[in-house]
Amino acid sequence: MSPTRAGRLLYERACEVLRLLEETGRQVTAIGRHDREGIVLGLTNGFANVVGRDLVLHARRDLPTVELSVVEERSVVLVEALERHEVDVALAYEVHERPGLLRVPLLEEETLFVTAPDSASRRRAKPSDRGRGRRGSRPIKFAELVTHPLVMPGPRDGVRQQVLATAKRLALPLQVTLDVSSVSMMKNMVARGDAAAIMPYGNVIEDIRQGTIVGRRIADPPLKRTMYLVRPMSRAAFEEEGGILHLIERMCRQYVDTLGELATPLAALRDGALHAAATTAA
């Protein structure tokens, strides 16, 4: 089912009106804040763990006219917050096409199979392996992964949905023994050997570096997900549009560098085309 020409025209004009209203609201708010533009940026836990601090510090130093607020949530929650206009722009994973949202794919990232370390693996691992974590062990095949009891986040989580879909496609049974929506609780249970898990590297980066959790890449097939910059089409452009997008691009590049072989930049990030792609409908 596709909209008629009249319907498309009405939608486009409605977006124009909403942008004008949004821009007026921003200007009025900026006057009340002594010309500081308020922007709410949504990030996932893993991304915030890796570059969140640097992002906030760079924003404070390089964007003095911006009052940046950061919201940390799961991707599905961030998308819903965008649609309610509680968040202005977000970096979220596996965002499907939705009316009124502009999506720009930024990078592709592998998730890891994480377990508690045993004493033998600790003795075998070199200090450099423990520091990097993710390269210290051989990859695990998906068919082997499913033989382990798993702790997984709730049904709406993107990683869980991907794991279940892959297992179904390969006709492999899963041993999901625990449903836990808390990242810190999942990591605690993995570290204590209660179960294994499939998690983004950013969520367990410090645990792997400290040796309390071991991360292994997943093969046959690897589990990959795409990070998008997402913003409402009805939102007016930021007054510091160029500065905000440059900051996001810079932090995404830093994130890719930190993940190394686990992340691949896509065209908008790789070719420096984020500003053009992210302002297409703004």
Predicted regions and their residues:
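Alpha-helical "hinge/linker" immediately C-terminal to small N-terminal DNA-binding modules
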Residues: 2-33, 250-253
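Central regulatory/effector-binding core of bacterial HTH transcription factors
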Residues: 36-99, 180
